């Protein structure tokens, strides 16, 4: 199926409107869950373990989104977190595909921590071209279209602000970085120990005084609890790097577009060449790294700096197979 420029622009607008209307349902769900907190039937269930949560509102939002898509784009394919969990496991094909996480940051949503969002991506010719991430709690809408930039709309800035929010500066070393990481839902001994060692090397003092072997002593580690919000914070410049193993395409698809259009570089596993192209293999590979845009210097282009820092990062952390 071929899409014209006008088709893609209309699709881009549709995704933004859909995210906002779905966001209203998320807010309704948050209110309902917080009112039921402490009761036996509070609408929160477990998937594979006690920290992999799903609520009736995740399902409701996804069903609402699917219905709107069927009504407006019946020929498109659909990949969604809750549909996938229920057995609807559509592959990425040449058919234009919506890739949706109805509530990214469900644990935050359940606890009333206002960092949850809906993430809507569109894959065309097996590559992400549209990304919309909306946090209804903060009324922040991030959106990007391949080749047209990415933007933030918020109550403070009702006119779209181009991302990143400030001119990208140089980035000489990992020691200058604020890095987004997550504990995730796989709490097995192997994964916890690998993450703990990785985080210790990133944050630890590797000097003779600090004695953390391989320590990079970065500025900080941050966990927002949402892959999509980590991606858009790299796009805006609030995070320098985000790295995670274990996410799924619906977690990252929209964020990939928004980050790339802000000058970010997205890659897969440590073995995957960093080309700047996010294809099906990276989207479904469940290992992701994104680094913010970096300004050119007389000594080094921004792209060369991004690749150098990703290499330095992967020399610091450990790898493992996602469950």
Regions found by a protein language model. Name each.
Residues 157-173:
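Conserved beta-loop-beta connector loops within the AMP-binding
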Residues 130, 178, 240-241:
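Short, Asp-centered acidic motifs that coordinate Mg2+ and/or phosphate
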């Amino acid at each position: 199926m071929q899409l014209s420029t006008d088709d893609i622009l209309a699709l881009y607008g549709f995704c933004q409107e859909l995210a906002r209307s779905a966001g209203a349902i998320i807010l309704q769900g948050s209110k309902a869950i917080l009112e039921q907190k402490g009761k036996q039937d509070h609408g929160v269930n477990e998937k594979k373990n006690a920290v992999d949560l799903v609520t009736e509102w995740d399902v409701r939002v996804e069903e609402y989104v699917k219905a709107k898509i069927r009504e407006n784009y019946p020929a498109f394919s659909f990949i969604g977190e809750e549909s996938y969990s229920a057995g609807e496991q559509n592959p990425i094909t040449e058919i234009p595909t919506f890739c949706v996480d109805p509530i990214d940051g469900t644990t935050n949503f359940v606890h009333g921590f206002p960092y949850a969002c809906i993430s809507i991506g569109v894959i065309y010719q097996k590559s992400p071209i549209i990304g919309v991430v909306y946090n209804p709690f903060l009324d922040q809408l991030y959106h990007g279209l391949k080749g047209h930039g990415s933007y933030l709309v918020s109550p403070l800035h009702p006119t779209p602000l181009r991302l990143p929010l400030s001119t990208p500066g140089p980035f000489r070393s990992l020691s200058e970085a604020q890095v987004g990481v997550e504990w995730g839902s796989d709490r097995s001994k192997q994964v916890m120990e690998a993450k703990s060692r990785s985080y210790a090397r990133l944050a630890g003092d590797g000097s003779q005084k600090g004695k953390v072997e391989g320590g990079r002593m970065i500025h900080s580690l941050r966990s927002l609890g949402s892959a999509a919000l980590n991606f858009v914070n790299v796009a805006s410049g609030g995070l320098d790097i985000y790295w995670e193993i274990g996410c799924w395409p619906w977690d990252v698809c929209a964020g990939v577009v928004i980050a790339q259009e802000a000058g970010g570089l997205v890659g897969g596993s440590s073995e995957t060449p960093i080309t700047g192209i996010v294809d099906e293999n990276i989207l479904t590979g469940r290992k992701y790294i994104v680094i913010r845009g970096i300004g050119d210097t007389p000594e080094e282009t921004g792209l060369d700096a991004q690749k150098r820092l990703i290499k330095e990062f992967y020399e610091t952390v450990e790898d493992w197979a996602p469950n």
